Amino acid sequence: MQVSNFLKPRIVDVQRINDYATKVTLEPLERGFGHTLGNALRRILLSSMPGCAIIEAQIDGVLHEYTTKEGVQEDMTEILLNLKGVAVKLHGRDEVTLNLSSKGPVTVTAGDIQLEHDVEVINPEHVIAHLTKSGELNLTMKVVRGRGYQSASMRIPKEEDERSIGHLILDASFSPIRRVTYEVDSARVEQRTDLDKLIIEIETNGTIAPDEAVRKAATILQDQLTAFVELEGKIETAKEKKAAEIDPVLLQPIDDLELTVRSANCLKAENIYYIGDLIQKTEVELLKTPNLGKKSLTEIKDVLTLRGLSLGMRLENWPPAGLREEETKVTA
């Protein structure tokens, strides 16, 4: 076997542990590749799998989560935590509003949620609340599709007045993956005994099959690595375009900064005609300019800050070709 030829692994075993958990075995892998691929797939599975989650709820008679409701054993914080445990699957849509209405005495579960034809609850036995004889629970919940984790604070309006009273915002974990572990054992091919065997065990919440989750994670990894496969062709193109990739703001004359006449004339006296010329100067260099004092320097720094620029920056390929010729025409 040639040194340059890598072994191509194959799936040798898919062991179904239960409806939500599966163990996948892949071999043979070159030495070290077991941990490389195992860690990459594990991270993608835990952080990048799309899923659905309840992100908002409204409960009749409840204005905020730090309260209780007569006839309901749990406080509102507990109910919101229980709602986060509902495994919802949307078919053909990215958002839906669902309702739940129950009267006690009863144990309210996810199976009591009123579903539409394209919405599925995977764990209908999941407990949401316990109602006594006088208890009643009417709530509306918003379910959306997303990826990763999103804290409630990210979705609360900055202005408190914009937040509707009674809207309870939940932290949302969209990932359908409950647990991922991997281990690397030794594998053998003919006389080679230094190879890896990768064993991945994955458990989901039931909204996606474990083997399907592994396929999606591998596809995501493959898509991300495609950019490196195409790297050679991009390098030459980048070199050709490098000279032209100059921020148009830097090509604007310093007159566009609307400086005082004194400051503008001082800069032009030092052959500083464009914003690109100016930002490459340091404060020390500008203070050496005749008739340009600290007040003018402060003015210059302020107008540059408004444009996201500052003094002392370094630019490649400056000045661009033809700029000085244009400058000569303007000043002639």
From Swiss-Prot:
Cellular component aspect of the GO annotation: cytoplasm; DNA-directed RNA polymerase complex
Enzyme Commission numbers on file: 2.7.7.6
InterPro entries in the cross-refs: DNA-dir_RNA_pol_insert (IPR011262), DNA-dir_RNA_pol_RpoA/D/Rpb3 (IPR011263), DNA-dir_RpoA (IPR011773), RBP11-like (IPR036603), RNAP_asu_C (IPR011260), RNApol_insert_sf (IPR036643)
Keyword Transferase set for record: yes
Reactions accelerated catalytically: RNA(n) + a ribonucleoside 5'-triphosphate = RNA(n+1) + diphosphate
Stretches of the chain forming a coiled coil according to its record: none
Entries under Pfam families matching the protein: RNA_pol_A_bac (PF01000), RNA_pol_A_CTD (PF03118), RNA_pol_L (PF01193)
Cysteine disulfide partners in this protein: none
Catalytic class of the enzyme: transferase
GO terms, molecular function: DNA binding; DNA-directed RNA polymerase activity; protein dimerization activity
Region (Alpha N-terminal domain (alpha-NTD)): 1-232
Chain positions covered by the region annotation Alpha C-terminal domain (alpha-CTD): 246-332
Metal-binding listed as a keyword: no
Alphabetized UniProt keyword annotations: DNA-directed RNA polymerase, Nucleotidyltransferase, Transcription, Transferase
Biological processes, Gene Ontology terms: DNA-templated transcription
Functional description taken from the UniProt entry: DNA-dependent RNA polymerase catalyzes the transcription of DNA into RNA using the four ribonucleoside triphosphates as substrates.
Quaternary data: Homodimer. The RNAP catalytic core consists of 2 alpha, 1 beta, 1 beta' and 1 omega subunit. When a sigma factor is associated with the core the holoenzyme is formed, which can initiate transcription.
Family: Belongs to the RNA polymerase alpha chain family.
Domain notes: The N-terminal domain is essential for RNAP assembly and basal transcription, whereas the C-terminal domain is involved in interaction with transcriptional regulators and with upstream promoter elements.
Protein name: DNA-directed RNA polymerase subunit alpha
Taxonomic placement: Bacteria, Pseudomonadati, Pseudomonadota, Gammaproteobacteria, Chromatiales
